[in-house]
Amino acid sequence: MGKSIVVVSAVNFTTGGPFTILKKFLAATNNKENVSFIALVHSAKELKESYPWVKFIEFPEVKGSWLKRLHFEYVVCKKLSKELNATHWICLHDITANVVTKKRYVYCHNPAPFYKGILFREILMEPSFFLFKMLYGLIYKINIKKNTAVFVQQFWMKEKFIKKYSINNIIVSRPEIKLSDKSQLTDDDSQFKNNPSELTIFYPAVPRVFKNYELIISAARKLKEQSNIKFLLTISGTENAYAKYIISLAEGLDNVHFLGYLDKEKIDHCYNISDIVCFPSRLETWGLPLSEAKERGKWVLASDFPFTRETLGSYEKKAFFDSNNDDMLVKLIIDFKKGNLKKDISDANFIYRNENVLVGFDELVNFITEEH
């Protein structure tokens, strides 16, 4: 059997979580016998030194527009797959490329097509999200049945894909969450928690319309008379129209602290000094703060959706609320403060106990490179 040539397409990943996904995937490709890896990226500047066994090909212009992106996926990639003699092709960013290879895979992580009840206000504040919702369902569909396997992060998305696209070769590939080395309180944390009796509630999220910051502001307003409860939110109001709107909703609230963007060390500090991680988001592929809160043993108050229940699984220090009901959230916070919040032993993953699941990028890369 000849050497396999695996092409990893990630031209759209440049920053944040998606770029982290690319780096974790590349790290998992090391020491694979009879396999060479080629990565198609926006820029290889930050990657070459860390992953010397990978050949990088740069496409800096592709991210410039959707037309360039689609031309790349459906025209350039076909030509490239022939020139590289690729045997395997994995698209890490949702679109199934038009290629000529023995094996073809796509990693689908954008849940926008499945967002329900988008409001006109949300469309005005983040029109790009509305376009994603409308177009991504169609983009997912193109070539999807030509894949050897389709990877998603959760079973709820697998069920959506089965229903919408009539395919059965969907593999759940979950991220492996590991705590950073800094997991203990430091002196720097004192700037946030001067009063040990204070109840601190943390919500780390970028300002997107589906993140549902409004619910936290509404709950904070109803709790404003209780001086020993405060909320830490990771927006500043300067990021976009939605962030500015949230700041305006919180006018006059002393119990809400807008911290802006935080680096990983400061995020860790906020987790450490928080009593509750609140997660009112209406849409996620996974919900990283849920996993990070679990790893730290924090109480989690989360919106009641399949993705939150699946991510939290059998974790007992959890409680759920309707994402449109601030009174439910307020009650949970008060119950916690009084010591009346009961642990939840339910496990949404129990029904999937007999399903095959890939955990972490090592297992994902092994699945791709092994014969099936």
Curated annotation (Swiss-Prot):
It is found in: Cell inner membrane. The gene is wbbK. Keywords: Cell inner membrane, Cell membrane, Lipopolysaccharide biosynthesis, Membrane, Transferase. GO terms for cellular component: plasma membrane. GO terms for molecular function: glycosyltransferase activity. Pathway: Bacterial outer membrane biogenesis; lipopolysaccharide biosynthesis. Signal peptide: none annotated. This is Putative glycosyltransferase WbbK. The keyword ATP-binding does not apply. It comes from Escherichia coli (strain K12). SUPFAM superfamilies: UDP-Glycosyltransferase/glycogen phosphorylase (SSF53756). Disulfide bonds: none annotated. The lineage of its organism: Bacteria, Pseudomonadati, Pseudomonadota, Gammaproteobacteria, Enterobacterales. GO terms for biological process: lipopolysaccharide biosynthetic process. It comes from the Bacteria. It is a peripheral membrane protein. The keyword Nucleotidyltransferase does not apply. CDD domains: GT4_MtfB-like. May be a glycosyltransferase involved in the transfer of UDP-GalF and UDP-glucose.
